[in-house]
Amino acid sequence: MITLAASLVTGFLVTFLSTPYAEKYLMASGIFAVDQQKKDKPRLASSGGMTVLFGFLSSITVYMALTSIPGGSTVNLTILLAALSSVIIISLIGLLDDIHVDLEAVMTEHLSIGDDEIDIELHRQTNIESLPHQKLLNRLSGNFSQGKDPNEDEMLRNGLGQIPKMLFVLPAALPLIAVGAGSWSMTLPIIDFTINWGIIYPLVLLPLGLLFVSNVVNMLAGTNGLSGGMSLMASTALGIFGYLNGQIEAAVIAWSLSAALAAFMYFNFYPASILPGDSLTYLCGAAIFSSMVVGNMEKFGVFIFTPYILEFFLKLRSGFSARSWGILQQDGTLDSHHDKIYSLTHVFMRRNMTERQITVSLITIESLICVTGLILFTVIL
């Protein structure tokens, strides 16, 4: 237990100490996004999931190192390394999505703000103000007042298309398939009926499950601290359930994510100083799914994922085109972009809630579902 605690503290500290530096680095690198639900629409560093990834990796690798010492606990290092591989692959896909720039939009924006051309030739010693993206940022932020209000643009970064993202996610399942993670059969509670999936499980169900979980975590976002907070609740519950059932590897994966997320929430909760980006939501989805599969906790995982499943069907109604974030009103509440409810956030927007209240409400609901699931699956079933 001391080994596990030491690894979790390491993951927390790595994320907590690296995030302030990441904020400056990401902004200087042009990896930022507009916080649309604030009055002044500030530009904040995005892709904060990278610091969570570093904390997650540090936690698990420290745990593996400490358990490898003679006299340490016996764990399946192969399973942990496979889970790490899957999480890293998906996190990189999220990072690619975060940094993908619409070059046509950039050129259009450039042409609309002046006739001066930007020199893209870089030298060994270059002042940050001379970098192309920084010149563009300076122009958009008011140093050159021509053109449209910079706060009216949503972002020049439009991300990868849905099809490429889906295809890129699938290879992340290969490490888990290679080590035979998960169970090829499932017993339904109450009726005690067992379904034997056979080869369908590793070749079909496992990749599709990873694809679904990573994407639905990405769907239920839009307010400061929402994606990180809900993932924190889910991963903590998974860790507890895995530990109680003797699935130590699953608990290590889940709690390592929890430790890193707890540190990140200090910076991402309302009002955020850094945004998570797809690198975080994809990372959380992959880590949570890996914990489910490694610990054979799919039934419990489906239960605590109830809000995400509801979000999926709500977004399906809109053809996956609806926005979860809202429009800031004069009184500080948020109003939906849509007349119908296409997201769980829209339910609370209709109740005239602020961004902070929406985030806290959804995290509270997820925590209650997790507690109910722990009682249901450990005591009753």
PLM region spans:
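Membrane-proximal soluble regions of multi-pass membrane proteins
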Residues: 307-358
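"…together with the soluble PPM/PP2C metallo-phosphatase catalytic core" -> "…together
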Residues: 1-315, 319, 366-369, 373-381
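Glycine-rich, charge-dense phosphate/pyrophosphate-binding loop(s)
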Residues: 361
